């Protein structure tokens, strides 16, 4: 059982945000980064290394991350962590179940059970789970089966979400959500 609790922190920035956003994106060098202006001068800036869900035709791929160390640590420290291995395995099982709700029976596969991924400032362990979609499954069906991603809630997902609601001081809002793009057939 795992609940991924978070703590909201607020910071005020005086002056233009562009240099701060640029520095954040350049330092983190995220695989998935975004700078979304909002009404009222607010913005969402995202520097996430995690790929929640990718669809290409009838294929779905999710790449959950569990286990993080500073980038200057020996990768074996992370690979030898039983705690991090157990957390990733638990989330992989949860995501296999989520994808199984929209997949062709027997067509959910763990492509990579656990690998080290190096980022600018951290090392992380990542898995890859893929599935072949059943015919007629659309975006809404996929999101209903998978969102929010188990790697940001914990497992079992519904119980973890209930605990998050009880224990966190405010709703997460865009934090731990998903930013991406959609086309007629594909999304990321």
List where the protein language model places each region.
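Extended alpha-helical targeting/anchoring segments
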Residues: 1-188
């Amino acid at each position: 059982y795992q609940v991924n609790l978070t703590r909201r922190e607020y910071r005020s920035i005086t002056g233009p945000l562009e240099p701060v956003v640029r520095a954040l994106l350049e330092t983190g060098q995220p695989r998935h980064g975004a700078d979304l202006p909002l009404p009222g001068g607010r913005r969402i800036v995202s520097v996430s290394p995690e790929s929640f869900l990718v669809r290409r035709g009838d294929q779905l791929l999710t790449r959950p991350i569990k286990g993080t160390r500073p980038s200057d640590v020996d990768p074996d420290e992370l690979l030898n962590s039983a705690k991090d291995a157990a957390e990733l395995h638990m989330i992989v099982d949860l995501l296999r179940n989520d994808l199984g709700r929209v997949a062709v029976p027997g067509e959910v596969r763990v492509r990579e059970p656990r690998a080290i991924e190096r980022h600018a400032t951290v090392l992380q362990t990542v898995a890859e789970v893929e599935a072949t979609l059943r015919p007629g499954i659309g975006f809404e069906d996929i999101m209903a089966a998978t969102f929010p991603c188990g790697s940001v809630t914990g497992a079992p997902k519904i119980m973890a979400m209930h605990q998050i609601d009880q224990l966190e001081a405010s709703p997460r809002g865009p934090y731990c959500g998903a930013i991406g793009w959609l086309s007629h057939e594909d999304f990321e």
